[in-house]
Amino acid sequence: MDLGTANTIIISDDKIVVDEPSVVALDRHTDKMIAVGEKAKMMYEKTHDNIRTVRPLRDGVIADFSACEQMMRGLIKMVHTGHRLFSPSLRMVIGVPSGSTEVELRAVSDSAEHADGRDVYLIFEPMAAAIGIGIDVEAPEGNMIVDIGGGSTEIAVISLGGIVSNNSIRTAGDDLTADIQEYMSRQHNVKVSERMAERIKIAVGSALTDLGDEAPEDYIVHGPNRITALPMEVPVCYQEIAHCLDKTVAKIENAVLSALENTPPELYADIVKNGIWLAGGGALLRGLDRRLEGKINIPFHIAEDPLHSVAKGAGIALKNVDRFSFLMR
């Protein structure tokens, strides 16, 4: 299970059985769950006073404990609807940010146990991503993983089944979305919701102002004028989005550089040889690999299915709990 700020993915028997937004809709009076995942996201930013939609995770860690518990329970229910073949006691491996404090780790395992987990193992996300990408994490050579999620970016150097140096920053996909929201308001005077900003990011988001042949079409944004509230149509091109995302992408660059500074020279040589792996939804930002490569002079590879690499790795770890037990807690 990859419990993410933006999406939660559950893998069971090597299949992705749940891939839903990490959103839950609750009744404001009783705090009962009304909807979870995609259904709740459809309600997000569209609710009246009796319903509140919550994103229980912020910056990669649990911000709203009871909402998170309800969300996990709701998503786990999706896995086995109806047939109670495997009884409620489940073994779970959950990916957590490598910068988590003891309290934050405790919150995740408690939530999982309340949501019917019996043996709950936690694995650090960069480690899970490495296993999911197919890197031999037990080999005596250095590999670097950059996992850019919704709430946090995890950068880790892995060797001999352990994390040698890690850097976890709370700058990630959500910040890119917020940058776009702020930019549209400031530059074009158009109010856009968080979801609209996310659509813009997916349609024309870029880390480079020159994408060459990969350039996406302009995206037409509809929204109210911030001042007059009249409807507007604004075409947005990827160059301007690249400019508005520049500062946030630079923060990620600097975090990668500072992780490299803390890497022992022997492992550094391995990383230059093997390249650096990009995982997480942020790895899909157009031109990010080329921009990082240009800045850092080490080749970057995008994982083949970056959105699911952490969940896949957690799934593999669950199947081989005995082999990977030293990676989990």
What are these regions (language model features)?
Residues 1-148, 156-276, 283-329:
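Nucleotide/phosphate-binding catalytic cleft detector across ATP-hydrolyzing
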